Regions:
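Extracellular polysaccharide-degrading/modifying enzymes targeting complex plant/algal/animal polysaccharides
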Residues: 1-175, 180-187, 193-233, 408, ...
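Glycine- and acidic/polar-rich repeat regions and solenoidal domains
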Residues: 158-174, 190-455
């Protein structure tokens, strides 16, 4: 039978990964310091754990820990000196907030945290640090048919969650079936807000990053095949509903996941201000980033001010993106491109074979669609941005050799693999769309992935 967890007052009950800190002492200027016994963290210390792994491109410098001032995440400084200076982070989409800094170091059995509060007294404000990796997530897989309704879920020290690795979020069904997450406010995750992703597989865990055994793409193919041996069937995994949630200010993604979100419905959510701090960069960042969105419906979501809006990567088979409003999913002109960051668009469909139906959406950002895929039908959309990288990224050039990205396709409406193939291109259909030319004052410049270049 279904188990329901419900806040008696909408958004009244809070499930948090953070603890309030009131033992700050003035260190220098605007910088205060506190000492936290490492026993508080148990076997996971966010202030010694880096955001890093496969498909992470922005360097190994940011930790999963975070400091919050009045529910806003502070920026991590690379040194105590940088924390004291409190200079603007030139990549931030919200530069006025980027002067609030923190820096942590270890001293024996204690974590020492310095923070620049720009003149505020942290003992008189609401100041928290995240200490827990997740907020609501079963330790074991297969805990199915739960409803989580009406909670505020916030401020967890989540880890970078690429497709060939264990994936966590502040709330996650953890490789199970039939969850309903509804009417929640989900915010201030260091990485992912909601994760519909992958279980821990010790033999497929960041192997490219830490063992250099196979390419990340091959590890993803392995993940699909190994998933068959770990219960990846329609009867066991997926069929979740995420509805009417306000998901914001998470730095990897609002909703992410590989394989565990199949047959799900994601509807009527407000997803916004994702990755606006621009501290994290890599190929897993978007309002929603789903691998293997088999028979997934993205419906009536309002997605804006995200690095990308909806990103369906691999196996977007039977996927429908319908009646969504997407706008302002683009880097502001004043912000520099983060080294390791990605280009921006409303929708990105990548190395899939379809069918992928994109219909009745309003796409208002500078770039509406990025297509490195086949088998897309785009119908009845209002399209106010350009298309970009059409067909690009379907192959990889490795050491001067073309390595085709061959990806799986599945028995219709199932997870069982039918085969693998390369992208043949050309099998895309466009019917009855309205294209609006914005007539920019200057020619539209498409930002590159990972550098400050343009086309």
């Amino acid at each position: 039978a279904r188990i329901t967890y419900r806040s008696t007052e909408p958004l009244g009950a809070v499930i948090t990964g953070a603890e309030e800190v009131k033992n700050w002492t003035l260190y220098q200027g605007n910088v205060w310091v506190c000492r936290i016994g490492n026993s508080l963290f148990g076997n996971y210390n966010p202030y010694t754990t880096y955001v890093y792994g496969d498909w992470y491109f922005a360097g190994r410098s940011k930790h999963t820990g975070a400091v919050y001032l009045n529910d806003k995440m502070l920026y991590e400084a690379e040194s105590l000196e940088a924390c004291i200076k409190g200079e603007v982070w030139e990549y931030s989409w919200e530069p006025e907030d980027s002067v609030y800094k923190w820096y942590a170091e270890q001293d024996g059995e204690e974590t020492v945290i310095y923070a620049n509060f720009q003149g505020k007294n942290p003992n008189e404000e609401k100041v928290e640090i995240n200490v827990r990796r997740e907020c609501f997530m079963p330790e074991k897989t297969g805990v199915s048919y739960l409803t989580v309704s009406g909670f505020r879920i916030e401020k967890a020290a989540t880890t970078w969650a690429p497709p060939a690795a264990y994936q966590d979020g502040m709330i996650s069904p953890h490789w199970s079936k039939g969850w309903i997450i509804e009417d929640c406010e989900i915010s201030n995750s260091k990485c992912a807000g909601i994760c519909l992703g992958k279980y821990l597989d010790p033999d497929n865990e960041h192997y490219f990053t830490y063992k250099h055994v196979k390419s990340p793409t091959q590890m993803e193919r392995d993940a699909v095949c190994r998933g068959q041996y770990h219960g990846w069937l329609k009867e066991n995994v997926g069929s979740h509903i995420i509805r009417r949630c306000n998901i914001h200010n998470c730095e990897q993604g609002g909703i992410i996941g590989r394989m565990g979100g199949v047959f799900s419905i994601i509807e009527d959510n407000h997803i916004h201000h994702i990755n606006n701090m621009m501290e994290l960069g890599g190929a897993e960042i978007a309002g929603t980033k789903m691998h293997a969105a088999i028979d997934v419906i993205f419906r009536r979501n309002h997605i804006h001010h995200c690095t990308m809006g909806i990103w369906c990567d691999w196996e977007a088979q039977g996927t429908r993106i319908t009646q969504n409003l997407l706008h302002d999913n683009q880097r502001p002109e004043f912000a520099k491109q983060l080294p390791g960051g990605m280009m921006s668009q409303d929708i990105f469909v990548e190395v899939s074979h379809g069918p992928t139906l994109i219909d009745n959406n309003i796409l208002l950002s500078d770039v509406s669609l990025r297509m490195a895929t086949e088998g897309v039908a785009m119908v009845h959309n209002l399209i106010c941005g350009s298309f970009t990288v059409v067909g690009g990224g379907t192959d990889n050039i490795v050491e001067g050799v073309n390595r085709a990205r061959y990806t799986p396709y599945h028995i219709p409406h199932r997870t069982e693999v039918m085969g693998f193939m390369t992208i043949l291109h050309g099998d895309d259909r466009f019917y009855n769309n309205i294209f609006v030319q914005k007539w920019p004052a200057e020619s539209l410049l498409i930002r590159h992935d990972s550098d400050d270049g343009v086309d």
